[in-house]
Design a protein with these regions (language model features):
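Active-site cofactor/cluster-binding pocket
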Residues: 1-4, 8, 13, 78-88, ...
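C-terminal non-catalytic interaction/assembly regions of soluble proteins
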Residues: 1-34, 38, 46
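Internal, active-site/partner-interface "lid" segment
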Residues: 21-23, 28, 49-67, 236-254, ...
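Active-site phosphate/pyrophosphate-binding segments
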Residues: 30, 36-109, 117, 121-122
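Secondary-structure capping and boundary motifs in well-ordered enzyme cores
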Residues: 217, 221, 350, 357-360
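Short cysteine clusters
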Residues: 271, 353, 358-364, 368
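Short, charged low-complexity linear segments at domain edges
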Residues: 325-352
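Iron-sulfur cluster-binding cysteine motifs and their immediate structural context
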Residues: 337-339, 363-374
């Protein structure tokens, strides 16, 4: 509508020699980062720019999309960008909201936070985008390159999520896992290894999973990981951050008892030193995947849909899909039975049936929506 208004206004004024182009953005609720905006301005420099265009998507059907190149960093100097990949319900989002409040209340820095959730909500993927800086932050878009990226669930590494691609050269990548180096070397994909080695990424691991169980916090390891973040990101002096975190924990949990408060204080103290730096091998720069790609079986049209659409979307890489991937699904209908291919493996531990303790009440069979015990 704005394009039509401008063209009409110029035509009514008799100024027909002015070149006007217009485009659409935010299609399908897509993010609009600086590289998309830069693509629009670059199109204007061409002798014959497209009158109508789209940005933010790869439109290989109508060919109206513009080529997007990596844009220069436009944030003010000194702005620190952090990105956290969590699991819905694990406390990552709550901890990051707490971090933003601590930094905003106790420093002179400007703060900004965006949070992404997938459709599964609890148990689904969450991505937290935090920015801190000494100057006002005018970045109404998600973080594309971060100084600090944290993976709070090891299954994302196994599945091949492209998290490390978000780290700036020389930045920090922290993985929450129970693995030693050999296991980490086995699970990391070759493209992630190459990026880490070639861009001098500072790689850290932290076993907040076992540490939380040891302290008595169960699955709630967000406090440990939050403490590790403040220690590694250097957004503010570590001692101050730890004290502010303890004050916040006391305020939040005192009504639940002093034991809960002490437990959180212990988690904060331990988390600040629980991480380990990984010495990145030089041969990672030329790493190649030796494991063959998993072969999917089933109806050809279903397998095609799983490979072309379901798998990239499951890895939070759906924004990279071209329009042509959906040509066979223009009416919104998709093949049935795709859930059989979606094995997310997000659980750190799985239950086993102990026949010596089972009284055969059958409650587990009818409570479980998948009746896995059967």
């Amino acid at each position: 509508p704005l394009y039509m208004d401008v063209v009409t206004a110029l035509a009514n004024a008799g100024k027909n020699d002015i070149k006007v182009i217009g485009g659409r953005y935010g299609l399908g609720s897509k993010d609009t980062p600086p590289r998309s905006v830069f693509a629009g301005f670059e199109e204007l420099t061409k002798a014959e720019p497209k009158r109508q265009f789209t940005i933010g998507i790869v439109d290989d059907v109508t060919n109206l999309s513009l080529e997007e190149k990596p844009a220069p960093l436009v944030a003010p100097a000194g702005t620190i960008a952090c990105k956290f990949w969590g699991l819905g319900g694990d406390g990552t989002v709550g901890a990051n909201k707490n971090s933003i409040k601590i930094i905003g209340d106790h420093t002179d820095k400007y703060v900004q936070a965006y949070f992404q959730y997938d459709s599964k909500k609890t148990g689904g993927v969450t991505i937290s985008h935090l920015r801190f800086g000494d100057k006002p932050i005018k970045s109404p878009y998600y973080i594309n390159k971060a100084d600090f990226v944290a993976c709070h669930n090891p299954s994302y590494i196994i599945k091949g999520f492209k998290m490390v691609d978000d780290v700036k050269p020389g930045g920090v990548f922290m993985i929450n896992c129970q693995w030693d180096f050999d296991e980490l070397n086995h699970h990391l994909k070759a493209d992630a290894k190459r990026y880490i080695a070639r861009n001098n990424i500072q790689l850290y691991t932290i076993n907040a999973i076992d540490l939380a169980i040891e302290i008595g916090m169960g699955k709630r390891n967000n406090t440990i990981l939050q403490s590790a973040f403040f220690s590694l990101a250097k957004v503010m002096p570590e001692e101050q951050a730890i004290q502010y975190m303890k004050d916040a924990a006391t305020h939040s949990y005192l009504k639940k008892g002093q034991d809960i408060v002490d437990m959180n204080h212990k988690a904060i103290d331990l988390g600040a030193t629980a991480y380990k730096k990984i010495d990145v091998p030089a041969d990672w720069a030329n790493a190649v995947d030796t494991k063959p790609a998993k072969e999917l079986k089933g109806k050809p049209e279903l397998v095609k849909m799983v490979k072309d659409i379901l798998e990239p979307v499951g890895k939070m890489d759906g924004d990279s899909l071209p329009v042509s991937a959906f040509v066979d699904h223009v009416d919104g209908q998709f093949e049935l039975g795709a859930s059989a291919y979606e094995k997310r493996g997000v659980a750190v531990s799985v239950p086993t049936w102990d026949s010596t303790k089972c009284i055969q009440c059958n409650q587990c069979a009818y409570v479980c929506p998948h009746a896995t015990i059967r």
